[in-house]
Amino acid sequence: MVLNKEIVLIHGTWCDGNVWGEFATGLRQMGYKVHTPSFRYHDLPYQECLAKVGTVTLQDYRDDLVALIESLDQPPLILGHSLGCLVAQMVAEKTEVAGMILMGPAPTADIFAFYPTMLACFGKHFLRWGFWKKAMPPYKKEFFKYCMNEQEESLKEEVFADLVPESGKVYTQMALHWFDKTKAAYVDFSRISCPVIVISGTKDKMTHPNIARRTAKNYRDSVLVSLTGADHMYESGKFQQKTLKVIKGWSQQNGFVD
């Protein structure tokens, strides 16, 4: 039995480390020691984040997490959600990790991502002059319709109330990666040899299920699981327990927990 195995949770767009809530509790009950960091400035109050986050880069997110991971006693698992999956892969390219859990992954640069629902969700930001250096505020209508489309209204309101702005620079590096001279969203998959599980949902409109399928194909030691009826919010609400069950089974199979 592996006791207190370290796992670092990497949240997605507009969120912070507090988003995990009962999901993190479920991982602790499996035997994991859970870390829930926030992306740079995402732990600040809304207006402070708005003023500072616009020009933060993908490399900033990666480097902050690499520093945390390398401070731990052992290489941890890393669990990413959405944008956090892209950052997780960037992290795993730079430092040793025991395994990766990727839920509704955002695309690395090699993967097509211009699906209609994704354009509808984020397109508004790219119509603003200076989008590449402006913070991207959470858009309520789009968040409800494309991220939490299968969830209860009360949960939608609860989650949205805690969201903060996202980096416009990060989204430019990810969505328009051919303009990024630093090639931040390009990942050398040959440098990552740990076991990987990719989790998707049949009703995920924020990151199309095809992206999850392509992500899994980039790794030799990978498993792809599709949750029937699940939207993008795997860690909350209706699909939380199903997601935890999948993670527990994979964790046991790989000897991470008993």
Show where each model-derived region lies:
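Alpha/beta-hydrolase
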Residues: 134-187, 194
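Flexible "cap/lid" loop of the alpha/beta hydrolase fold
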Residues: 101-131, 170-178
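Catalytic active-site module of serine/aspartate enzymes centered on a nucleophile-bearing elbow/loop
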Residues: 222-258
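Conserved alpha/beta-hydrolase "acid-adjacent" motif
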Residues: 205-211
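Short beta-strand/loop motif that positions the catalytic acidic residue
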Residues: 192, 198-200, 204
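Conserved alpha/beta-hydrolase
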Residues: 28-49
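Active-site glycine-rich loops that stabilize anionic/oxyanionic intermediates
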Residues: 12-15, 82, 202
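Gly/Ala-rich beta-loop-alpha elbow adjacent to hydrolase catalytic centers
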Residues: 79-84, 88
